[in-house]
Every structure is written in structure tokens, then in C-alpha cells.
């Protein structure tokens, strides 16, 4: 028996079997390809394989990957067929690589008809390194294929696309109209790099109804050679540009990327207000680099130089973020882009000014097997005229 006051037990995490939730497919995947054709919760951990995982049409699967390496020379290592819904949870470090031309690392498929598409949602605290080949995406479409809905809520995603493809989004030689072909980023750290003639995040060629929505997180989007913009449509040839994104909505987050000049009118917030980028710098470039900060209701991280790439409406003058319990702000984003610590008085708004009662929640999300429908209500909130506190939390009840 142990004497709790004197004895110590050291446990190495590598000596402890991982806790699994749901059906463990690790052994099956080591022995061959795996097909998920039943709704359920699944786990794959600590494997290094050349086999593939396919989630069949109509299946809803919660899949956790933990310290997984998947490489395929014949296919996408992970295939999500059109009409399938996958919640992908990432733990540890995971690497997914396609080496066959025209194949995505993680294939999120859609057909060329209305509302026939797959949905991939990624979250977790781990790392996902995913690479596609030429003419395809890292996460998204194969060659001659539309991409489905891609939602990223968390994790560190390092996505690399092939030549004429995208890191996250479409492949080339596509044609069709799928309303759910959206890319939505709500959180996480996303490093997206495209191959030559490709954009990092977006649709390619003739895919229509594609939208990019950013509500939070940090995005570093790097275009391929011969392309001057990293977010939006790609290029089929060195001389031909093809439209692939209808709208780009930025409601939060830090987005380090560029847009084609004709696409800047498409960059807007959820209310349709046109946006412009402002690059802000935290006051300590060493201590505050690669750190999480809060802006209103969403979170992001600074880059390696402690910079934030935020989007604001025309006429915006001030901006404030919270880091380590302190507020950093500027009152003049045009001329003072380095944030300084706020040292003024606390918030003086009364409860009557800072609270509002709603008859229903401010957002209702209806989940369906082939998509989501969101109904949003907005409420104007004005702080007390004499209050100088830079950030305000609106308490909503219903």
C-alpha cells in the first residue's frame, strides 16, 4: 500500500493506453481499408498506414483521430462521400497525405445538384497536417469535383494544396451549383498554402454558390506561385481566371491573406457592410507573439510578430482586445496601429444599459443530415454616453 504523504507514483503517458470513445477502428485500418456505413462514434489512434477510410453517403459519424499517419498513392486517405456528415476530432499530431494526382488529402465531396453535399466539421486541441496533390485540395475536392461544406471550429490545421488546387476548398475542372459549398472557420489556427496557380482557401473555376465565412480563429493563407491573392477563386491556367466564390464574410478572427482586386467588394460582415483590413500590433512583439486574445465574443491568436489582421467597417476608429486579463486598445486605427494597455476607469454603464431581454435566443441553428439552417436575430446595444470603457459584454436573457 502507498503512504500518500511520502510515496510518489510516476506515470509516463506513453505507457498508458488512450481512452477511446466509441468503436476502435485502429486495428481494422492497419489490416486494410475501412468503410463506415453505420451512424456512430469511432476512434483511430497510433497507426501509420497506407489504407483508407471511407464514410458512406447518408452516414453521420463522429470520428476521433489521435497520432495517426495516413498516406495513400491510390486515393484520398479519408473520403467523405456526398451526403455524409463527419465530425472529426483531432488529438495529438495527425498527418494525412495523398500522393496520387487529382486526389485531396481529406476528400469532402459534393455532387453537381442542389443540396447534395457532404459536411466535415473539425475540432479538437490537436494538430492536423493534410496534403493534397496537383489539381486537388488539401481538404475538400478532388479533380473534377465540387467540395462540400467544411467547418473548422478548433485545432491547428496545416493544409497544403497541389498545383491549380486549393489548400482548403475546390479542385480544378469543376462545374456545378451546390448551395452548401461553404467554408466556415469559427476557431483554431489555420495555415493554408496553395500550389502553383492555386489559392489557399476558396473555390476553383466554375463552382458556384461557394462562400467563405470567418467568425473567429487565426488564418494564414499563402497563395501559390503566379497568383497574387490567397483567398477566393483560383486559376485554371496561367492566363485564365475563373470565378469560384460568391461572397466572403468576415465577422471575426485574424485573417492574414489577400483578395483579388475585383473580390474586395465581396468582403463583408454578416450584415452586408463592406470591410477593410487593418493590421494591429500588440505592444510586446516577443512576449505577445503566438498568443490567444479575445475580441468581443470570439478568440484568435497573434502571429509570430504579435500582429493581428482584423477587418473593420469603413469609419471605424477604435479597436480593443483582451489578453491575460488586460485590455489593449487604439482610438485611431489609421495612425496608431500598435495597441496600448488601457489604464482608464472601469465600466460605468448601469445594468439597464448593459442588459437586454430577448424573446428567443439570438441564434437558432437547425441541423439536418445535409446541411444547416441558421436563423439570427440582431439587437442594437449602445453603451452609456459617459462610459469610456473600451469593451462591453451584453447580457442576454430570454
Language-model features: where?
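N-terminal domain-start segments of secreted/luminal proteins
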Residues: 2-72
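Thrombospondin type-1
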Residues: 347-357, 363-398
Amino acid at each position: 500500500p502507498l503512504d500518500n504523504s511520502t510515496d510518489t507514483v510516476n506515470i509516463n503517458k506513453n505507457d498508458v493506453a488512450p481512452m477511446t470513445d466509441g468503436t476502435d477502428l485502429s486495428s481494422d485500418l492497419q489490416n486494410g481499408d475501412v468503410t463506415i456505413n453505420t451512424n456512430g462514434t469511432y476512434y483511430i489512434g497510433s497507426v501509420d498506414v497506407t489504407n483508407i477510410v471511407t464514410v458512406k453517403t447518408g452516414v453521420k459519424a463522429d470520428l476521433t483521430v489521435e497520432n495517426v499517419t495516413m498516406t495513400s498513392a491510390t486515393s484520398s486517405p479519408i473520403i467523405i462521400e456526398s451526403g455524409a456528415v463527419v465530425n472529426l476530432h483531432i488529438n495529438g499530431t495527425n498527418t494525412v497525405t495523398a500522393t496520387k494526382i487529382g486526389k485531396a488529402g481529406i476528400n469532402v465531396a459534393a455532387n453537381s445538384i442542389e443540396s447534395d453535399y457532404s459536411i466535415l466539421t473539425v475540432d479538437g486541441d490537436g494538430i492536423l497536417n493534410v496534403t493534397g496533390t496537383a489539381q486537388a485540395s488539401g481538404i475538400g475536392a478532388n479533380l473534377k469535383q465540387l467540395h462540400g461544406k467544411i467547418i473548422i471550429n478548433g485545432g491547428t490545421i496545416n493544409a497544403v494544396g497541389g498545383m491549380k488546387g486549393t489548400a482548403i476548398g475546390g479542385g480544378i475542372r469543376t462545374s456545378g451549383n451546390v448551395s452548401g459549398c461553404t467554408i466556415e472557420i469559427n476557431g483554431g489556427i489555420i495555415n493554408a498554402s496553395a500550389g502553383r496557380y492555386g489559392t489557399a482557401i476558396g473555390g476553383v473555376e466554375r463552382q458556384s454558390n461557394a462562400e467563405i465565412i470567418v467568425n473567429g480563429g487565426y488564418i494564414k493563407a499563402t497563395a501559390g506561385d503566379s497568383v497574387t491573392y490567397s483567398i477566393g477563386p483560383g486559376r485554371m491556367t496561367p492566363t485564365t481566371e475563373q470565378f469560384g466564390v460568391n461572397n466572403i464574410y468576415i465577422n471575426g478572427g485574424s485573417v492574414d491573406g489577400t483578395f483579388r482586386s475585383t473580390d474586395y467588394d465581396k468582403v463583408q460582415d454578416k450584415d452586408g457592410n463592406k470591410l477593410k483590413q487593418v493590421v494591429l500590433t500588440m505592444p510586446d512583439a516577443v512576449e505577445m507573439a503566438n498568443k490567444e486574445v479575445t475580441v468581443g465574443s470570439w478568440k484568435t491568436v497573434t502571429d509570430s510578430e504579435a500582429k493581428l489582421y482584423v477587418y473593420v467597417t469603413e469609419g471605424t476608429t477604435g479597436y480593443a482586445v483582451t489578453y491575460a486579463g488586460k485590455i489593449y486598445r487604439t482610438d485611431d486605427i489609421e495612425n496608431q496601429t500598435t495597441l496600448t494597455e488601457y489604464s482608464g476607469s472601469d465600466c460605468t454603464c448601469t445594468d439597464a444599459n448593459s442588459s437586454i431581454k430577448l424573446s428567443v435566443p439570438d441564434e437558432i441553428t437547425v441541423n439536418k443530415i445535409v446541411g444547416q439552417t441558421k436563423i439570427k436575430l440582431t439587437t442594437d446595444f449602445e453603451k452609456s454616453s459617459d462610459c469610456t470603457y473600451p469593451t462591453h459584454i451584453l447580457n442576454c436573457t430570454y
